[in-house]
Amino acid sequence: MKDLLKFLKAQTKTEEFDAIKIALASPDMIRSWSFGEVKKPETINYRTFKPERDGLFCARIFGPVKDYECLCGKYKRLKHRGVICEKCGVEVTQTKVRRERMGHIELASPTAHIWFLKSLPSRIGLLLDMPLRDIERVLYFESYVVIEGGMTNLERQQILTEEQYLDALEEFGDEFDAKMGAEAIQALLKSMDLEQECEQLREELNETNSETKRKKLTKRIKLLEAFVQSGNKPEWMILTVLPVLPPDLRPLVPLDGGRFATSDLNDLYRRVINRNNRLKRLLDLAAPDIIVRNEKRMLQEAVDALLDNGRRGRAITGSNKRPLKSLADMIKGKQGRFRQNLLGKRVDYSGRSVITVGPYLRLHQCGLPKKMALELFKPFIYGKLELRGLATTIKAAKKMVEREEAVVWDILDEVIREHPVLLNRAPTLHRLGIQAFEPVLIEGKAIQLHPLVCAAYNADFDGDQMAVHVPLTLEAQLEARALMMSTNNILSPANGEPIIVPSQDVVLGLYYMTRDCVNAKGEGMVLTGPKEAERLYRSGLASLHARVKVRITEYEKDANGELVAKTSLKDTTVGRAILWMIVPKGLPYSIVNQALGKKAISKMLNTCYRILGLKPTVIFADQIMYTGFAYAARSGASVGIDDMVIPEKKHEIISEAEAEVAEIQEQFQSGLVTAGERYNKVIDIWAAANDRVSKAMMDNLQTETVINRDGQEEKQVSFNSIYMMADSGARGSAAQIRQLAGMRGLMAKPDGSIIETPITANFREGLNVLQYFISTHGARKGLADTALKTANSGYLTRRLVDVAQDLVVTEDDCGTHEGIMMTPVIEGGDVKEPLRDRVLGRVTAEDVLKPGTADILVPRNTLLHEQWCDLLEENSVDAVKVRSVVSCDTDFGVCAYCYGRDLARGHIINKGEAIGVIAAQSIGEPGTQLTMRTFHIGGAASRAAAESSIQVKNKGSIKLSNVKSVVNSSGKLVITSRNTELKLIDEFGRTKESYKVPYGAVLAKGDGEQVAGGETVANWDPHTMPVITEVSGFVRFTDMIDGQTITRQTDELTGLSSLVVLDSAERTAGGKDLRPALKIVDAQGNDVLIPGTDMPAQYFLPGKAIVQLEDGVQISSGDTLARIPQESGGTKDITGGLPRVADLFEARRPKEPAILAEISGIVSFGKETKGKRRLVITPVDGSDPYEEMIPKWRQLNVFEGERVERGDVISDGPEAPHDILRLRGVHAVTRYIVNEVQDVYRLQGVKINDKHIEVIVRQMLRKATIVNAGSSDFLEGEQVEYSRVKIANRELEANGKVGATYSRDLLGITKASLATESFISAASFQETTRVLTEAAVAGKRDELRGLKENVIVGRLIPAGTGYAYHQDRMRRRAAGEAPAAPQVTAEDASASLAELLNAGLGGSDNE
């Protein structure tokens, strides 16, 4: 009976677990895993191939080699199951136990585990508070360590050399205890009292003030507490028993010719066993100390190599000079256990083949070769054959399929019907890289792919291959059909625009059929409808392009969503009328009544989806494709050499440019311009010439002159094939046509600099040898770049996925009122992105009011769809506060309202959607399109940088924000604030343009004044920074002593003299401490106060400042007192493209970041040191001033006595995101990162929705540093998960206690991935050893919240359809129900019964 119970217990699967804990293994635990001790280094007998007894492959310890058969062959078959053979001692069971049964080795001397010793920071070193060097010297038998000092003057843990030890031994005898080797370290660890040590350290922490000491102490406290809380014992970091991996995980395979292939682990284990046995023997023989010591050291090294080869000293190599793969190497890296077997697996029921076009397929179909289908669906076919009674057994069915009998094909047809397959093209950069289709059987061996899904797969038909997978279970088929079918993935998850968009031939065909032509056959007819138009065209009575009137019936949706017909006569062409026949009801005719290019077609599909929904759009897309292909064939568009028309003016333009270049060369030789200026000018001249040539060429291609019906000449858009292809967006661009028929233009060298001699020829004329060489020179760089780019982009995607993988939508509404203000993106005079594009699909965080009133336009918590956005535009709303994932209050995951619309589906996001992964893919996927190049500012760009005025483009009124200004003597405004913005507002109050205005700019128009388009509203000198007085009065020089602090210089050309302030380095000793300044006094000589303060108006002058006033002159407010020359910013490289995106997400500090004000207050300068200035900010409220040392060469934007706000820029430069977070808060840093990333993508014309970047930013902000612990259990300065602090504070506040105060941290994506709560996820990402060591010591629990952890433990992921499963488990656990018990299968039951009966027959209880 006992056996029966045992059997039933063993049948229940123990799959139900909620978390995984990692901890140190105690020696007893290792013994409890083990099935026996491995005593011999032998593996298998090379003659009989049987495993040696007690060896590394011993059958007695690890289990039988053959199923249900003992080694000597006494017991065979199932009936002896569970018997232990008395001859060979092997249990009769399945051979797969050799994969799970472990053994152990009893070590003769303890050895340290290398991970806890050498993985930095060394855990053993930190725990004992001893330097790693010393511990290593003890472990590897170079010195002694004192364990008990006794009554002597020796300290515990003191290190003694051999001589010192012998001296001490003579002096004290056995009063004290000192040892060497791992035993000594073990004894030290064993005798530690962790709790008392903790108390002591906490006391020290409260007493000490030094920063470094505090850091060290907190580290130790954290480690000690981890040991106390996890129940790990410190001495377990020293191994006394070594576990042995099951033999089938370190196989030994006989090759032919009597050789063996073996896993490296066997070699490493053999060395350990050999040395261990030798040591045992030496100890038994009581060998001399020095020999034993050497053997112990060698054992330590052998164990080190087994655990992590190469971490200490040289790696042990095999016979072929390659380092052996240790246990640590088995789990880390791309080929390790995590990434090779747990996160990525090979799958059954899959095949791959080349793809070709399937233009006749429907959108949801793919062509599957019969051969492949037969192989993939074999089990289904066998099942069907048996079900029909066509085959009696599976074996017979197999035979039938092999013979390929006729009936098999009919059955294959049945099986395949309604059974979707998945198609995948590597690299799978986003979720549209795997889609489901219904297979259609075809002859041939290539998979046929629908042309419209090529864009999503990024596939072309030049030999690409794709893989097919068969979803087997019913659930999988359901998901494939409902979620992954290509017809359900019409919109791109990255930006919510259609991704199923016709391209190339289809676009050309539609463009051709919707073009109009002057005086075509049949012009001026009036037709009864599209049907008649098609009849006339087919019968050759009317041309496709003829301008005609057609009666068109449009359908419009009324308020109830019913379709209402409306008929009218339209001016159109025959082709457009024919195209109208396939447009679904409900769309306006205006949508096809134009020459349709790629953009127009995309817009048409988008409109169709938004108005009519999914099904009509899919049918429409298919119809568009068939029509496009048909008319592209009809058009007969082809490219001949005569289509490349070279403009006549080309030679004239080129000779003019050459003359200009010659002139500049002369100026250079006569020394009037520098080499750099000459180079820049030459490049400008050629760039301008190139533009002129290409303009002439395009004008030439674009139009042709024809005779119209009245016999007059008329210009019309040309039907030149090359022009049509470019104009429609089918293929090619103006730049490419320019190279064909204009001039090739300027070429770049591989380092990105431009070669100043352009290629004046084009491809039609042909290149000479020199030109050909120049053009290959730069082109090769492009190819090398592409290869690098792909790898880099893939790595960026991997890091992004890793940081965001556990972010899932977990609730509907977190109830927060927080959000971010959305305004249109305006750069200079252009609206780069209008407000509607930014808020579309977001949820409002607060009521949006009608501008100028208190009426609510859009209530809070409204999902802004297209209609709402139209309403916002009509009311010219300028800024909307929307919910954002960055400010979402959900603890684990985010809520649906903060995320908004699911871009790929068009409704609010569902719970369980894995938004983190979607965001990562959306940002990573276009990565390959970004440039790798970091571009230098060269040529035209550098002159544009030195702007000196603002000229507005539109008319409107001026609005200045954060501005301080004074009026000068001529009544103009002079700006005296730092980050002033000038906006142009149109009559509806919408911002049209926005400019930055520098300090000292003179405004022509004031705040709120009207300006006309093209008017200049502000001027300034770009090369100097003025010092402007805010008061009127008389100038009084202070500390300005000629020769000491200033020097007089006279300009040679004008003869005017000016004073120049000396740098402190140039001053004499007496002038070092003087501070030259200009004071403003009134006529009586009293100080004038700055208005609104009680500070006298005096302006301190920095070094190099130029003063053109004399002492005692009268000045008025707004005048320039002095000018500080600005060294031009040099050519700082702008990092662009992919590296810039990576820098932003890694939150790297820029080289010379902008210096921001840490607190608000008044600026003054303290005592200078040799190379630095001391900046002091004194708060107005009288709290402590803040000091900072700033290098002298940094240019400051502030003067003495100026008031700054916290977060203001003190010295220009690229801003460091950490500073923005610290000084301006979470929303500011979000805005900064989002805008910077978008700038890079916008340059490449890639559209990504802001919320994807916000999702990544949320993950970068997931840690917080504790500033003050309050009544919580956190340590001051500890970095913890933000959600944990929030939860802890909520509980504390509920109990009326003080919560912890914290500051948010910004981590780069790599750091953030490694700092996740889940150690499984972190270990599978990077630095596996370090992560696992840390986790084991702390005894971490992995709650399996993220996606990766669940994939690794082999569960459904808690997202998508798996979300419900996980919710259900949590609910059941909360209710305390038992998980559904797995049913025992019939065969298992019969087998176990047989086993029980056998055991009963054997009569002996082999326990």
UniProtKB/Swiss-Prot annotation:
Mg(2+) binds at D460, D462, D464. This is DNA-directed RNA polymerase subunit beta'. One of its GO terms (biological process) is DNA-templated transcription. The lineage of its organism: Bacteria, Pseudomonadati, Pseudomonadota, Gammaproteobacteria, Enterobacterales. DNA-dependent RNA polymerase catalyzes the transcription of DNA into RNA using the four ribonucleoside triphosphates as substrates. Its EC number is 2.7.7.6. Zn(2+) 2 binds at C814, C888, C895, C898. Keywords: Acetylation, DNA-directed RNA polymerase, Magnesium, Metal-binding, Nucleotidyltransferase, Transcription, Transferase, Zinc. PANTHER family: DNA-DIRECTED RNA POLYMERASE, DNA-DIRECTED RNA POLYMERASE SUBUNIT BETA. It holds the Pfam family RNA_pol_Rpb1_4. The gene is rpoC. Coiled coil: none annotated. Zn(2+) 1 binds at C70, C72, C85, C88. Its cofactor is Mg(2+); Zn(2+). GO terms for molecular function: DNA binding; DNA-directed RNA polymerase activity; magnesium ion binding; zinc ion binding. Belongs to the RNA polymerase beta' chain family. The modification N6-acetyllysine is found at K972. GO terms for cellular component: DNA-directed RNA polymerase complex. The RNAP catalytic core consists of 2 alpha, 1 beta, 1 beta' and 1 omega subunit. When a sigma factor is associated with the core the holoenzyme is formed, which can initiate transcription. Binds 1 Mg(2+) ion per subunit. It catalyses: RNA(n) + a ribonucleoside 5'-triphosphate = RNA(n+1) + diphosphate. SMART domains: RPOLA_N. Transmembrane segments: none annotated.
